């Protein structure tokens, strides 16, 4: 049995909880607050029930017009020149309550018009919420 729901990823309704699986596809780097979305995945009123799966697919193309730089999960150098990678930021954000099961690249082709296409390689990561 499958239920599909659509809502604002940064302000999800309180009645959304205990799903077996949640898919976050190509939206994380377009949210004004990725932490608000990710923080809603677990806890007493978590979207994902214990033992459930989260699939996050993202190209990590952070842009300040969508997401303030100070809340990016990665994709930048800090003032001391250290690289911060989105993959590591995502794992850190979910790591205390989720185990990484799999990750791989997922190519994507977007047709803008008959003569222009965008080729993008997103990263797909699969996590399981700890019991």
Question: What residue spans do the PLM features occupy?
Answer:
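Core SAM-dependent methyltransferase catalytic element
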Residues: 96-99, 103-131
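Conserved acidic residues
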Residues: 18-20
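Conserved beta-strand signature within the Rossmann-like core of class I S-adenosyl-L-methionine
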Residues: 51-59
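Short catalytic micro-motifs in class I SAM-dependent methyltransferases
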Residues: 26-30
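A short glycine-rich, Lys/Arg-flanked "PGG" loop and its adjoining helix->strand segment in the class I
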Residues: 35-50
């Amino acid at each position: 049995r499958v239920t599909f729901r659509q809502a604002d990823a940064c302000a999800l309704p309180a009645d959304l909880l205990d799903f077996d699986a949640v898919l976050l596809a190509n939206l994380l780097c377009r949210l004004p607050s990725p932490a608000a979305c990710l923080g809603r995945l677990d806890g007493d009123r978590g979207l994902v029930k214990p033992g459930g799966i989260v699939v996050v697919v993202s190209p990590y193309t952070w842009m300040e017009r969508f997401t303030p730089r100070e809340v990016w999960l990665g994709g930048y150098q800090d003032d001391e020149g250290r690289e911060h990678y989105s993959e590591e930021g995502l794992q850190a954000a979910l790591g205390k309550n989720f185990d990484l099961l799999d990750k791989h690249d997922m190519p994507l082709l977007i047709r803008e018009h008959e003569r222009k296409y965008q080729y993008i390689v997103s990263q797909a990561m699969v996590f399981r919420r700890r019991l």
